[in-house]
Amino acid sequence: MSLGRDRYSLPRTYKRVSHAKDKARPELRKFGWETLGYSESFNLPPFRDSIQRVDGNNLTVEEFRRDFERPRIPVIITGLTDNWAAKDKWTVERLSKKYRNQNFKCGEDDNGNSVRMKMKYYHDYMLNNKDDSPLYIFDSSFAERRKTKKLSEDYSVPKFFEDDLFHYADDKKRPPHRWFVMGPARSGTAIHIDPLGTSAWNSLLQGHKRWVLIPPIAPRDLVKPMAHEKGKHPDEGITWFQTVYKRVRSPSWPKEYAPIECRQGPGETMFVPSGWWHVVINEEYTIAVTHNYCSVENLHLVWPKTVKGRPKLSKHWVKRLTEQRPELLEIIKSASEIPLYDMNESSSDSSSSSSSSDDSSDESDCDDSGRCGGRKRKNDDRSNECPEKMSTTYFQNSLV
């Protein structure tokens, strides 16, 4: 940190924040976290909100599937959080009091270990930092820890996303799929595609988020910052908005890759279909919950990616689906007999800033701390097999 300890209200915040920063972003020890002065100079330009909004109270599950999920069209659904306890409980003041001594993940170190900070220190940091791209709570295990699992009781999965087929896999085997998300202005997520072909929903309880979504057919080298643009924050949402966003808004941007832009507000739930590029930045402090999921509508996309990226999981998963959802086997068979769908990603989101990720080679490499583009996990097995051949034969062998 470039400024002194007197910025914070708690005497230990400076030390705790410095420790977390050294672990999560050691490359910034010499360069500094405030060097670019974004807290004073960064402003999002005016834009036209182009996403469709629908009232969740007047939308049936079948209408959602027909109009949005099946054709893979992003949408904001309103009214889904109206009856959540989180609507009242998830304020900065209440969370910082109730969970003040609980640790939350705000990054990862170079070995892939979680970097955590107590809520009371993060709260102090969030309200008083001037970092260019601040630390961001993106915690995937909050519902599994005894002292924070009550957060999962404050909301319910909306009816449109309840049929998550990964539920049939053991909790210990399935990838991380839900995150408690909290962060200040300028934190966010670098451009990415969600892992394993999953779709996602993100319900915002506090603050505002700016989203840009780009169609799946857009090539990776077009939507990512160029090498000379990456600077000291190559995998941060704020870097994307300072570089690529200017091209996206220019008249020369290809019309077939036309983006959808929106400003998500409290009580709104974003639906991100499988394969869509998306980048998010917080305009102010925000609190949200987000889930990734597999449904009947995107199973044909998720299955081949799971076989390729998580073969052990896929073998376990297909056995469970055979036992409990046998009507889905035809979808899996069809998906196994065709080449993996191409998202134009040749190397496998949530930056010290939102989204999940995986080791699959055709998604952006994002960990569940919000950091994109960094380290990868090793595939669990058979990762060098031809994916097309593997999809067909692996399905057959999994049922033996």
Curated annotation (Swiss-Prot):
Miscellaneous information on this protein: Worms lacking psr-1 display more cell corpses than in wild-type animals.
Family: Belongs to the JMJD6 family.
Biased composition (Polar residues): 390-400
Binding site for Fe cation: 192, 194, 278
Keywords: Chromatin regulator, Dioxygenase, Iron, Metal-binding, Nucleus, Oxidoreductase, Transcription, Transcription regulation
Gene Ontology CC entries for this record: cytoplasm; nucleus; plasma membrane
Purpose: Dioxygenase that can both act as a histone arginine demethylase and a lysyl-hydroxylase.
Subcellular location(s) of the protein: Nucleus
Region (Disordered): 342-400
Ligand binding (2-oxoglutarate): 202, 290
Domain of life: Eukaryota
EC number: 1.14.11.-
Broad class of the protein's primary localization: nucleus
Bias (Low complexity): 346-358
Gene designation: psr-1
SUPFAM superfamilies to which the protein is assigned, alphabetical: Clavaminate synthase-like
UniProt-recorded name of the protein: Bifunctional arginine demethylase and lysyl-hydroxylase psr-1
Cofactor: Fe(2+)
Binding site for substrate: 189, 209
Residue ranges with Basic and acidic residues bias: 378-388
